[in-house]
């Protein structure tokens, strides 16, 4: 399935685009971004420098007819309402309801596929009720989907960064997932894990120039993180 996707040319829109990280990944695999949306001024400025175009603003003000036809919708919708580091208000937080703005555009435009991203905390938020609502909405939109919590360190990135990823396909395309019951024309496989060749302690020099010195407080903080991560994921 991955090889087939790379050989295809498809159009995408990039919602909650930030500075364009998701867009870069999709473009490296054959996508053409036809529209993006981001509300943060500073993120928009960086996005414009990266891609020479300014994203649309507030997603709640975007009308379906404002969007060029596209095949895939991507959305890293706000994670703060569901994050361990946030207030964990979920759908009670205005930002949490922005998932329904994504659903609104999916319903109106019926793209072939979607890719959603959030923090891992969304899975257990509100005793699982939040993820249940999201699943029910996506089912009602008539999409076949699966989600995973994946750690960036398992896929070639030297950082422990767990995120929730959800991939979905319009049901009429007859695309299923590995291990899913039923017969499908095409099976989608989530990426396989890989082993990192180096740990942090393998690349940090033992002796460095005084010109790179930092404050004692900063040094203590750095040493704390080095000790925590030098052995790699556990």
Describe these PLM feature segments.
Residues 116:
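A structural signal for conserved, well-ordered secondary-structure elements
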Residues 58, 63-66, 151, 170, ...:
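Short, solvent-exposed coil/turn linker segments
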Residues 56-58, 120, 142-154:
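Conserved S-adenosyl-L-methionine
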């Amino acid at each position: 399935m991955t090889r087939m996707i790379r050989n295809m040319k498809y159009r995408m829109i990039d919602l909650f685009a930030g500075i364009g990280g998701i867009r870069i990944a999709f473009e490296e695999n054959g996508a053409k971004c036809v529209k993006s949306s981001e509300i943060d001024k500073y993120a928009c400025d960086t996005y414009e420098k990266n891609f020479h175009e300014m994203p649309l603003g507030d997603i709640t003000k975007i009308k379906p007819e404002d969007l060029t036809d596209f095949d895939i919708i991507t959305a890293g919708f706000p994670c703060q309402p569901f994050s361990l580091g946030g207030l964990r208000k979920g759908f009670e937080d205005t930002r949490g309801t922005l998932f329904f703005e994504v659903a609104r555009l999916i319903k109106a435009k019926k793209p072939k596929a979607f890719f959603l991203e959030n923090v891992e905390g969304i899975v257990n938020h509100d005793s699982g009720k939040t993820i249940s609502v999201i699943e029910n909405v996506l089912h009602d939109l008539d999409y076949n989907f699966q989600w995973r919590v994946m750690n960036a360190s398992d896929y070639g990135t030297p950082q422990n960064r767990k995120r929730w990823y959800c991939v979905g396909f319009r049901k009429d395309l007859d695309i299923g997932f590995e291990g899913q019951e039923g017969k499908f024309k095409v099976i989608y496989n989530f990426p396989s894990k890989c082993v990192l060749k180096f740990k942090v302690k393998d690349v940090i020099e033992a002796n460095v120039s005084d010109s790179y010195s930092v404050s004692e407080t900063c040094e203590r903080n750095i040493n704390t993180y080095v000790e925590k991560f030098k052995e790699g994921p556990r």
